[in-house]
């Protein structure tokens, strides 16, 4: 993989694909983590004498939509990088090209949301060529988007000398440790809503791991596959056989699987609703399981004891609605308390839990990519990485 150390930026206009897909509310950025993570790459290039053109997406607009403008991101970036300014032009436009060509060394230009361009997600070759006119070299530092074969990730990288930024390199180095000779015992904690989102990563990791802890709504598909009564809990009915098969494979490989013993349940998902705790395999209708229960939190903490490598992706419950965030926070605390282990967390809610607990420094690596980290662990590569090799 070509990295920043292979690029001499002096006097060059460098096009950088960053991941500024951050939460914005009332025109203000709510979490600057991804902006801060991009700064080492940007500062390195500026110190080397480059001018920079930045590309990013924000949300999933269906074309130009002021609610998804990068203007608030430009404001937040400027607070950390005074050289930066936002230009409200779609990156494939003539105006964007003129703005880019007028840049002097040391200047930074953030263009409008790449997803305002109709060809971005189709990896349109013509749009990729228009992006390529914005710079003389391309740096991919958007790990969170590296699993998407889009024009600003893959298309433009084929048309310019392309390099991995520092964040990209850091992510690949950390996640590779989870695949190549990880220190044992190795525990994986998976949560979130759907088994279908995690099948690939479970199949890839099963031969490498010792313990698999499953929480979140996806646990109910496994519990029902084992004959449990799960009330109105979310179940993927078309994945019951697959869940049973995965449990059988885990057993054959000697992997110990931990499923919830009890759950916090309610009749509907809303803050302050009346809750009950039930055994995970005996949830009565009309209740649905919305978080792992107190016994499960203790059991999961015990299951993590002594682990030397841990990967965690996905919340243990409906994290955004208290009190169903307790299980996720408990798992975050248990992993952070491990001494001498290499611990990696990825995925929006899991990372949000770690940040809320103020325990980011207690993790070996906090990944900026949820879907990207899962796909990397499943396949060992990503579309955005493949174009940087050679």
UniProtKB/Swiss-Prot annotation:
InterPro entries: Phosphoglycerate_kinase, Phosphoglycerate_kinase_CS, Phosphoglycerate_kinase_N, Phosphoglycerate_kinase_sf. It holds the Pfam family PGK. Substrate binds at residues 19-21, 34, 57-60, 115, 148. Its EC number is 2.7.2.3. One of its GO terms (cellular component) is cytosol. PROSITE patterns: PGLYCERATE_KINASE. It catalyses: (2R)-3-phosphoglycerate + ATP = (2R)-3-phospho-glyceroyl phosphate + ADP. It is found in: Cytoplasm. The keyword ATP-binding applies. The keyword DNA-binding does not apply. It comes from the Bacteria. Its main location: cytoplasm. Keywords: ATP-binding, Cytoplasm, Glycolysis, Kinase, Nucleotide-binding, Transferase. Monomer. HAMAP family: Phosphoglyc_kinase. Belongs to the phosphoglycerate kinase family. This is Phosphoglycerate kinase. It comes from Thermus thermophilus (strain ATCC BAA-163 / DSM 7039 / HB27).
């Amino acid at each position: 993989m070509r990295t920043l150390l292979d690029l001499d930026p002096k006097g060059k206009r460098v096009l950088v694909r960053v991941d500024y897909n951050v939460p914005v509310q009332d025109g203000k950025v709510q979490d600057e983590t991804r902006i801060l993570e991009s700064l080492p790459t940007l500062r390195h290039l500026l110190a080397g004498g480059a001018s920079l053109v930045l590309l990013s997406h924000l949300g999933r607009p269906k074309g130009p939509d002021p609610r998804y403008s990068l203007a608030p991101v430009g404001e937040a970036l400027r607070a950390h990088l005074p050289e930066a300014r936002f230009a409200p032009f779609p990156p494939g436009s003539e105006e964007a090209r003129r703005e880019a060509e007028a840049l002097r060394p040391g200047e930074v230009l953030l263009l409008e949301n790449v997803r305002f361009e109709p060809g971005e997600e189709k990896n349109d070759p013509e749009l990729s060529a228009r992006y390529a006119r914005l710079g003389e070299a391309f740096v991919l530092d958007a790990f969170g988007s590296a699993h998407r074969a889009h024009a600003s990730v893959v298309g433009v990288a084929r048309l310019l000398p392309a390099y991995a930024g520092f964040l990209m390199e850091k992510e690949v180095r950390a996640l590779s440790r989870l695949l190549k000779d990880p220190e044992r015992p190795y525990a994986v904690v998976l949560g979130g809503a759907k088994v279908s989102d995690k099948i690939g990563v479970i199949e890839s990791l099963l031969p490498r791991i010792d313990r698999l802890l499953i929480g979140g709504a996806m646990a109910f598909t496994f519990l029902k596959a084992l004959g449990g009564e799960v009330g109105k809990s979310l179940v993927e009915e078309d994945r019951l056989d697959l869940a049973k098969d995965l449990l059988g494979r885990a057993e054959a490989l000697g992997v110990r699987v931990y499923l919830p013993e009890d759950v916090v349940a309610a009749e509907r998902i809303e803050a302050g609703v009346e809750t009950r705790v039930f055994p995970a395999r005996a949830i009565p209708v009309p209740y649905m399981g919305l978080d792992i229960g107190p016994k499960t939190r203790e059991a999961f903490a015990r299951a993590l004891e002594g682990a030397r490598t841990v990967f965690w992706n996905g919340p243990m419950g409906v994290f955004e609605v208290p009190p169903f965030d307790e299980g996720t926070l408990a798992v975050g605390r248990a992993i952070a308390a491990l001494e001498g282990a290499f611990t990696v967390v990825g995925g929006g809610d899991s990372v949000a839990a770690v940040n809320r607990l103020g325990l980011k420094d207690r993790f070996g690596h906090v990944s900026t990519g949820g879907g990207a980290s899962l796909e990397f662990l499943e396949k060992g590569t990503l579309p955005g990485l493949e174009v940087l090799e050679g």
